[in-house]
């Protein structure tokens, strides 16, 4: 039996199985040991079953796949060769695990006889990602003693675990040489595949899983709790689940606190600012019940409120993950938000607390005055909605800007917002944004800090394949301005936290053949944005600001609102 032919047969079954689990995008890094998998992915692309994407940097490739999976809400497969190529996927795997994004990670490996004996590019790859995958599938070297049916069943069991929990399936695939000599005809006619001929034609899963839909029932004490003083807190949610929360909370007369990732239009915007007001926060803590939809809040003030609240606490979240870092004694509903709302009709009543609305209105005027008309981090955050396309998506990086956007921006209802807030790292943000653009096939506005951009420069190469207008805002405040919030000596802060780079991104844009603009005023920016939307390609828009402007304004707003006396 030809080793190269059987390597391809083995790979054919793996890839065909993943396609039947919903994979339509395969992200591939170049490498020799992964050749059997790569060639089968190419065959599937030629057959119209998948789209293949390539990138030379495995770390960026992992986040690119993450972005596609976020946008399509379908699993994405990644193929890499053996050695440290596999380790570079770890950050994206961590983020996927934290946020329940489905990835199939296929790591080609040296065969077992080459492990731990000094062979080139052979590292210990089995279970190398620890507890982060929902399933680790450590395959043997391709061997006809294992039936094709066994291989499919093993992979589908892992895929079932993924559907239940959300996250990463790691499939480690050792291959012996030779890797290159097989033809498609030799593979397709191999006797090992004969029992699968009907399966290969029908395109159905090997194991049919009947999913039981659990109906959401009204809580037995809902008629009691809906008469009480309540606060609704909304974190990161899929866009389709945001509808109806605002009107439901308004009908109840309850206070609504929303995260920018929620897609919910706030009734009392600027929560991150006005929650700094001690008088209002103390009154809010007198609520009888808090109902939290979603999780992973950006706002420090919302998190502080959740931590301080000691009353009845309900959490509505469909993933089943533990998403209460403050360890409330709570009632949990594993349900989609709109299903839960339908099962818990509101009781129409007047607002029980008027101060948040009054303070929110005061903030609107006060913030406008403080931000002013110059092109700065804060003004970009405040007026970001004027720059967004009607049918587009927004990606926010992990920097000072995401906090300013969360504090100051009011987006249209259910406007798609993507973030990497699972581990909240600054790695892979450009790559994730590129993947979201490819996966959504919509115009993208990405807003990313300068340090984050420097950390992921290689991923600018991924934007050459976008087919929709893509605006990459790089906020250049000369380093990590987010660290201005720390109570650290200024000299120490510069040397060990902010790390000023004193550069710009014009030559970087040229290197990656990106359109580049550096507007100085809002008039300049509006002109640049108009031109960028006329092109079905990426434009890098660099906004240079003074290092401390954004952080100083943010601290000033919080400080002044904290002492404001507002009549309800």
From Swiss-Prot:
GO BP: menaquinone biosynthetic process
EC number of the protein: 2.2.1.9
Cofactor binding note of this UniProt entry: Binds 1 thiamine pyrophosphate per subunit.
Keywords for the protein's UniProt record, in alphabetical order: Magnesium, Manganese, Menaquinone biosynthesis, Metal-binding, Thiamine pyrophosphate, Transferase
CDD domains, per database record: TPP_PYR_MenD (cd07037), TPP_SHCHC_synthase (cd02009)
Enzyme class: transferase
Pathway(s) annotated for this protein in UniProt: Quinol/quinone metabolism; 1,4-dihydroxy-2-naphthoate biosynthesis; 1,4-dihydroxy-2-naphthoate from chorismate: step 2/7; Quinol/quinone metabolism; menaquinone biosynthesis
InterPro entries recorded: MenaQ_synth_MenD (IPR004433), MenD_middle (IPR032264), THDP-binding (IPR029061), Thiamin_PyroP_enz_TPP-bd_dom (IPR012001), TPP_enzyme_TPP-bd (IPR011766)
GO molecular function: 2-succinyl-5-enolpyruvyl-6-hydroxy-3-cyclohexene-1-carboxylic-acid synthase activity; magnesium ion binding; manganese ion binding; thiamine pyrophosphate binding
Catalysed reactions listed for this entry: isochorismate + 2-oxoglutarate + H(+) = 5-enolpyruvoyl-6-hydroxy-2-succinyl-cyclohex-3-ene-1-carboxylate + CO2
Required co-factors: Mg(2+); Mn(2+); thiamine diphosphate
Task performed by this protein: Catalyzes the thiamine diphosphate-dependent decarboxylation of 2-oxoglutarate and the subsequent addition of the resulting succinic semialdehyde-thiamine pyrophosphate anion to isochorismate to yield 2-succinyl-5-enolpyruvyl-6-hydroxy-3-cyclohexene-1-carboxylate (SEPHCHC).
Family: Belongs to the TPP enzyme family. MenD subfamily.
HAMAP family attached to this UniProt entry: MenD (MF_01659)
Assembly with partners or alone: Homodimer.
Name of the molecule in the record: 2-succinyl-5-enolpyruvyl-6-hydroxy-3-cyclohexene-1-carboxylate synthase
Taxon lineage: Bacteria, Pseudomonadati, Pseudomonadota, Gammaproteobacteria, Pasteurellales
Gene this chain is encoded by: menD
